[in-house]
Amino acid sequence: MSEKRVEKKLIHYVKKALNDYHMINTGDRVMVCLSGGKDSYTLLSLLNSIRIEGNYKFDIFAFVLDQSQPGWDDSALRGWLDDKKIPYEILTRDTYSIVKEKIPAGKMYCSLCSRLRRGIIYRYAEEQGFSKIALGHHRDDLIQTLLMSVFYNGQIRSMPPKLLSDNKRHVLIRPLAYCQERDIIKYAMEQQFPLIPCNLCGSQKNLMRQRVKRLISDLAKENPKVPSNMLRALSNIKPSQLMDHELWNFRELNVD
């Protein structure tokens, strides 16, 4: 697939997500969380292209959190943002030391790291008056999270394309919700984004997610529609076919 075809495909699916879930309103100030990875770079690049087209009227801002990880170098990232004329701020907060201190060696850092990062993101967005916080999770993240929640937590849940935070102060959006990771990888390679590796957890493999990813891949070899059907299932819920006591009062579920 050519460079333009990949970009066109991704923009199509981002626009579809924006429209299906009413993610961005006219006049919104959208804060894109840029981690330095392929997903967040792709999100920022595509949203910026859509903004420049002019059919969606919103402002965009890149928020980068420097977590004081060893070897962190954002010079190329700064150059890329300057070249694209995207306003940004790189905020330094030493969450790295906290995570290393609190989490025993060999354990996964992701949970604590994400909680600390989320708190900083929320505070910054509120202080600066941003109306939307954009995250780079894509289709593969959503369906993998669904199975991980079922297999390991006993819950039917995932990552919604649009979410009101628990404190009701922030709206999170995931414009890449319909985009496949393989297309994002192609796009990131073509764009030659100056990626920044995560030295905190980048070397740690999330074994649960890797197993689920392999399972979905194996099933897709037998039936290519499996991933898209899983995504469709997230918006095609049949509560009457489930067994949640919070949805139904089974004691009183009788024929009159």
UniProtKB/Swiss-Prot annotation:
Pathway: tRNA modification
Catalytic reaction(s) noted: cytidine(32) in tRNA + S-sulfanyl-L-cysteinyl-[cysteine desulfurase] + AH2 + ATP = 2-thiocytidine(32) in tRNA + L-cysteinyl-[cysteine desulfurase] + A + AMP + diphosphate + H(+)
Record keywords: 4Fe-4S, ATP-binding, Cytoplasm, Iron, Iron-sulfur, Magnesium, Metal-binding, Nucleotide-binding, RNA-binding, Transferase, tRNA processing, tRNA-binding
Motif placement: PP-loop motif: 35-40
EC number(s) on file: 2.8.1.-
Domain of life where this protein originates: Bacteria
Pfam families xrefs: ATP_bind_3 (PF01171)
Binding, [4Fe-4S] cluster: 110, 113, 201
Listed cofactors: Mg(2+); [4Fe-4S] cluster
Gene3D superfamilies: HUPs
Broad class of enzyme this protein falls into: transferase
UniProt-recorded Gene Ontology molecular function terms: 4 iron, 4 sulfur cluster binding; ATP binding; magnesium ion binding; sulfurtransferase activity; tRNA binding
Keyword Coiled coil: no
Subcellular location: Cytoplasm
GO biological process: tRNA thio-modification
Note: The thiolation reaction likely consists of two steps: a first activation step by ATP to form an adenylated intermediate of the target base of tRNA, and a second nucleophilic substitution step of the sulfur (S) atom supplied by the hydrosulfide attached to the Fe-S cluster.
UniProt cross-references to PANTHER family, sorted A to Z: AMINOTRAN_5 DOMAIN-CONTAINING PROTEIN, SULFURTRANSFERASE-RELATED
Family as reported in the entry's similarity comment: Belongs to the TtcA family.
Assembly information from the UniProt record: Homodimer.
Name by which UniProt lists this protein: tRNA-cytidine(32) 2-sulfurtransferase
